[in-house]
Amino acid sequence: MLDERLISSHLLDEDDNNENSIRPGRLSEYIGQEKVKENVEVFITAARERKESLDHVLLSGPPGLGKTTLASIIANEVGKPIRKTSGPAIERPGDLAAILTNLEPGEVLFIDEIHRLNRNVEEIMYPAMEDYVIDIIIGKGPAARTLRLDLPPFTLIGATTRPGLLSSPLRDRFGISCRLDFYTPLELSEIILRAARILEISLDKEGATEIAGRSRGTPRVANRLLRRVRDYALVKGNGNIDFSLAKWALEMLEIDECGLDVMDRMILEAIIGKFSGGPVGLDTLAASVSEESDTISDVYEPYLLKLGFIQKTPRGRMATEHAYRHLGYPLKGNLEGKGLFSDA
């Protein structure tokens, strides 16, 4: 198993430069998320006709679905520069004040992982978002006084993978909220073909479809797999990626037809083989596969839940009928004939 998961939806070191070269710059180039695109286009057009700054935007959804890309596209569409930072990087209220007071009129401020903003920093954000002002306390004790600074109109775009962790006062100040969902295999295939054209990779539709089917519904994963399959095509093939080459390369990378890697299968096999299908507690499961509990719950479980391979119950994790069938295990008696959504 490779040290860094090829199918991780989180950004790996090599992804940043590669993604920048293939990121779309306009809504017309952005593939998928049709409802979100339609709504965003309406909001941008309306703000332009009113000659106002676009309302503040909250982008939520699993990692790797294009929240940062969409933020950059919004800035391009409104014709304003974008300034990027992240929640953990803004440690003190003064850090945020410095950013806000240096914004140009209409500029877009993008804060990734906005759910990780310090609460003291967050309180500075409230009047800035509502009234375009910030209050700075000067001095200490009885001599302290508040200085109010006016800010130019700006648009805040916040991105989060965990919208439930945002405080209600902050969440309620976003006038526009968009949730990005997993992509269909057809959409991913189009994304892969577009990336291949930009990167000058020889790839046919069947090869793109095979890569898309194992990309976990995530463009970041799809683009990463494309680059790894390209390596196999260059070294072990003739440089061209077709269905057979893509299928063989992905099998060499130990990524199956559902997009599961070695650790995904180890988790399912542990639940089925060691714990009779469950239920099994998270800590016990993590110990059985030599992994951290938080890593299991944050990195591996979401996709297994999406596929319906595991269930979370009050007593622990259970493998479903789909997991038994996928791994080729005989069904337990209480699973025989029962689907995940069976009434029985």
UniProtKB/Swiss-Prot annotation:
Superkingdom of this protein's organism: Bacteria
Sequence positions that bind DNA: 312, 317
Reactions this protein catalyses: ATP + H2O = ADP + phosphate + H(+)
GO biological process: DNA recombination; DNA repair
Cystine residue pairs: none
Position of the signal peptide: none
Keyword Ligase attached: no
Record-listed Mg(2+) binding positions: 68
Keyword Repeat: no
GO MF annotations in UniProt: ATP binding; ATP hydrolysis activity; four-way junction DNA binding; four-way junction helicase activity
Gene Ontology CC terms: cytoplasm; Holliday junction resolvase complex
Family: Belongs to the RuvB family.
Function description: The RuvA-RuvB-RuvC complex processes Holliday junction (HJ) DNA during genetic recombination and DNA repair, while the RuvA-RuvB complex plays an important role in the rescue of blocked DNA replication forks via replication fork reversal (RFR). RuvA specifically binds to HJ cruciform DNA, conferring on it an open structure. The RuvB hexamer acts as an ATP-dependent pump, pulling dsDNA into and through the RuvAB complex. RuvB forms 2 homohexamers on either side of HJ DNA bound by 1 or 2 RuvA tetramers; 4 subunits per hexamer contact DNA at a time.
UniProt free text on domains: Has 3 domains, the large (RuvB-L) and small ATPase (RuvB-S) domains and the C-terminal head (RuvB-H) domain. The head domain binds DNA, while the ATPase domains jointly bind ATP, ADP or are empty depending on the state of the subunit in the translocation cycle. During a single DNA translocation step the structure of each domain remains the same, but their relative positions change.
UniProt name for this protein: Holliday junction branch migration complex subunit RuvB
Protein's organism: Syntrophomonas wolfei subsp. wolfei (strain DSM 2245B / Goettingen)
